[in-house]
Amino acid sequence: METGVIFGFLETIKNLSKRFDTNKFVFCWDSKKSKRREIYPEYKANRNVDKTETEHIEDNIAFKQFHDLRVPILPKLGFKNIFIQTGYESDDLIAILVRKRLKDAIVVTNDDDLLQLLDCCEIYNPRTKQLITCETFESKYGVHPSMWPHIKSLAGCTSDNIKGIEGVGIVKALIFVKGKLPSGKIRDRIFNNCAILKRNTPLIKLPLEGTVLPIIQEDEKFYIDNFIDVFEKYNFRSFLKKESFEQWCKLFRME
């Protein structure tokens, strides 16, 4: 049984709990069905085009482990705020939660689409180990985070296969929204392609229209026996070592 993804995910939870001194986690997952693809059929159509058979097999193995995390592993451990919504992405759920429900939230992601939320949360990038705030964003880009959807709509998003305006990348888009792009071909091209902006903005701006606000449950409790059961079932012996398990117990205030 492949368990590498599960182990890595749980280890990340432990490390985040230590770094931010919390046992409060909210997990948001992508739906397999995509309303964005209904709006724009080319959305993410590039994701599987050039993958080898081996890569497809690896993806399927990882998908099964992520499914097992969502049901049954995380609930068994005691986590209750685990959300998925048909047709919507984790980004949509995160966005509506931090805008309407969660205060002082730290969003853990390496997806720069979520930078638009920095006016109401902080973002921790697990790859760079960097905590991004509204202030650090404004210092780097010279605009408020609320402008990010407009910038991305102009530039497009290669990873999501959203085509922007030809010749306009993030740098040119930033110059344009600051009102500093000089007259010329690029500026004319932007004004002549308003239809692209009209198409892209609803795809990029978060949350997607129609996202329903999840209900946060506050009554989470974590029990030693449940953690032992999960760690033994998946043979996570390093988590069961005395020092490591004592850390788990302390971090999650287990009973």
Model-assigned labels for residue ranges:
Residues 1-108, 114, 119-131, 205-222:
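Noncatalytic, basic helical substrate-engagement surface that gates or grips nucleic-acid strands
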Residues 15, 19-29, 44-50, 79-82, ...:
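Non-catalytic nucleic-acid-binding/docking modules located in mid-to-C-terminal regions
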